[in-house]
């Protein structure tokens, strides 16, 4: 959430940022609403101040035996008591309206973010590795998995409907191996602390990271009002909600390997075959909590940590700087890692790493104190996939496919595969 004080002082900057995202100007509307709220706050404060002053004056009048003045003041206090509830309700209503309006406004992109409309305007930051060179024809992951006999979409549909997958045998083990490899890498070498956290959260947590209220249709909601997490970003970031941290203990770096749940409400007709776009999928999430001065450098570090996963798996990928029209709601800058999928003859997103500044922290009221600071400051938050496990499995299947239809296990995963070096067709 943006700072209304900043908006009051920089209305043109807000509208310019919204224009970069393809949104209509809102500064004038927000400032007008804030002026009404501030006027209501002042009215309430004036009434309270006058009530307190009049109450003291009653005592003084009675001490002076001025009964007429005392009765007049009592009548004034009684009138204020009748007026005050309506004034307080108006203040609460206008404050809630302002918070709701602010909560629907996206973050302000950094100046170095390319301006564009959609994914076609994203910029290549770097390319790592090369496309595999084969004599055989590439195949898509679902063709490979079904031919091997370990990827079952029919039974998944019988159990749960569309956009679910059942993996069995060595493919189930490969999925588990990928997740374990990612967690081990990030905790042992990258300095992240592993967290096991709930998969269901309160609305306040989803609001804190920015999915509510604007993107509720993308979420799964339980009958008691909780939400299934769309990503462990929600739980990991909200660990510091409503806390004041010591600056010297920052940054905090958290990681978790969890299922993620998404309705894919806006994805009708997209990636309907296979397991590229699922309602439920495993993902290794990275979250950093920093001070205001360190977040940009931390963003580069986090992205490098995610890239290392793909490098060690020997996968060809590119890192993209997302344009203003393609970046997420809460982000100030985002790098997407896109892995090469030979079966699709295309790069596809496998990780997204974003720096959010204090946007989420304001929603969560998460702050830190410095040694010499009189006032607490909002933390900066970052999140990234390190990486999506299912999409990584897809990449391994398509890039390590052999001519006979078997799939070679990448060397870095061998310690997790119980002696298996190749996945071959089920007998």
From Swiss-Prot:
Catalytic reactions on record: tRNA(Ser) + L-serine + ATP = L-seryl-tRNA(Ser) + AMP + diphosphate + H(+); tRNA(Sec) + L-serine + ATP = L-seryl-tRNA(Sec) + AMP + diphosphate + H(+)
Residues binding L-serine: 231-233, 285, 385
Keyword Aminoacyl-tRNA synthetase part of the UniProt annotation: yes
Keywords: Aminoacyl-tRNA synthetase, ATP-binding, Cytoplasm, Ligase, Nucleotide-binding, Protein biosynthesis
Binding site for ATP: 262-264, 349-352
UniProt-recorded Gene Ontology molecular function terms: ATP binding; serine-tRNA ligase activity
Subcellular location: Cytoplasm
Pathway: Aminoacyl-tRNA biosynthesis; selenocysteinyl-tRNA(Sec) biosynthesis; L-seryl-tRNA(Sec) from L-serine and tRNA(Sec): step 1/1
GO terms (BP aspect): selenocysteine biosynthetic process; seryl-tRNA aminoacylation
InterPro entries for this protein: aa-tRNA-synt_IIb, aa-tRNA-synth_II, aa-tRNA-synth_II/BPL/LPL, Ser-tRNA-ligase_type_1, Ser-tRNA-synth_1_N, SerRS_1_N_sf, SerRS_core, tRNA-bd_arm
Enzyme Commission (EC) number: 6.1.1.11
UniProt-listed PROSITE patterns: AA_TRNA_LIGASE_II (PS50862)
Pfam families referenced in this protein's UniProt entry, alphabetically: Seryl_tRNA_N (PF02403), tRNA-synt_2b (PF00587)
GO cellular component: cytoplasm
Record-linked Gene3D superfamilies: Bira Bifunctional Protein, Domain 2, Serine-tRNA synthetase, tRNA binding domain
HAMAP family cross-referenced by the UniProt entry: Ser_tRNA_synth_type1 (MF_00176)
Function: Catalyzes the attachment of serine to tRNA(Ser). Is also able to aminoacylate tRNA(Sec) with serine, to form the misacylated tRNA L-seryl-tRNA(Sec), which will be further converted into selenocysteinyl-tRNA(Sec).
Oligomeric and partner information: Homodimer. The tRNA molecule binds across the dimer.
Domain notes: Consists of two distinct domains, a catalytic core and a N-terminal extension that is involved in tRNA binding.
Family according to the record: Belongs to the class-II aminoacyl-tRNA synthetase family. Type-1 seryl-tRNA synthetase subfamily.
Protein name: Serine--tRNA ligase
Upper classification of the organism: Bacteria, Pseudomonadati, Pseudomonadota, Alphaproteobacteria, Hyphomicrobiales
